[in-house]
Amino acid sequence: MAFGLGRQRLGLAAGIAALFFRELAALYCVICWLLDASERRWRLVAGWTLGMIAYAVFYAVHMSQVGTLVDTAARAHDEGWLQLGGAGFVISTAQMNAYLLVLPQWLSAVCLVLALLGAAGWNSPAGKRLAWTLAAYLATFAVVGQPFNQYWGCLYAPLLCFALARSVAAVGDLLKASGWWHDARTSVGHVDRVVAGR
């Protein structure tokens, strides 16, 4: 949201802070790094780079300390993170939105598709960042994550509201581009003239 409001430094600080809270935010940080590099925002690129290096050092120190305390038999589960959960797992992560959590899963699937359409049609710097973030997390969660990791959707599900709001305009643009919207309006106008006796 900070990037959408033109507050790049705040967005950078929030992204790096999120990374220190949860390593899953690394994907967002890499996306921001790539987008800022493509737009030649070198100060932001430097900020992302320094933040990710600081996190890598922090994580290495953490792993070295924890590694000496944890026995190899103390694993939480035997299966790996690569689960290929596909659309089912992705839709379950999309439900981690205050509105979608209480609705049936099929409705979450419809909202997810509409939100992706809205994100794809949002042609602005903020829209680009949102669309790439959604695409990256959805692609990742289609192959990575245990069924009990549904809560990972909290990373991206709040963004679905913004993209869903844009879906109405995106559907309108698609209808206009297809010519169907013009044909439908012409047909309705013709019916109105026939009914009016003109």
Residues covered by each model-derived region:
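Membrane-interface alpha helices of multi-pass inner-membrane proteins
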Residues: M1-A2, Q8-D36
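Hydrophobic membrane-targeting alpha-helices
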Residues: A2, C29, W33, V57, ...
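Transmembrane helix irregularities
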Residues: F3-G6, A17-L24, V57, V61, ...
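Membrane-interface junctions at the ends of membrane-embedded or membrane-associated helices
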Residues: G4-A13, D36-L44, L164-R198
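Membrane-embedded alpha-helical segments of multi-pass membrane proteins
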Residues: F21-A26, L107-C111, Y156-A163
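Membrane-lumen/periplasm interface segments of specific transmembrane helices
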Residues: V30-L116, G127-L134
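Transmembrane-helix signature of polytopic, lipid-linked glycan biosynthesis machinery
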Residues: L134-Y151
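Hydrophobic/aromatic-rich transmembrane helices and adjacent perimembrane loops
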Residues: N149-A169
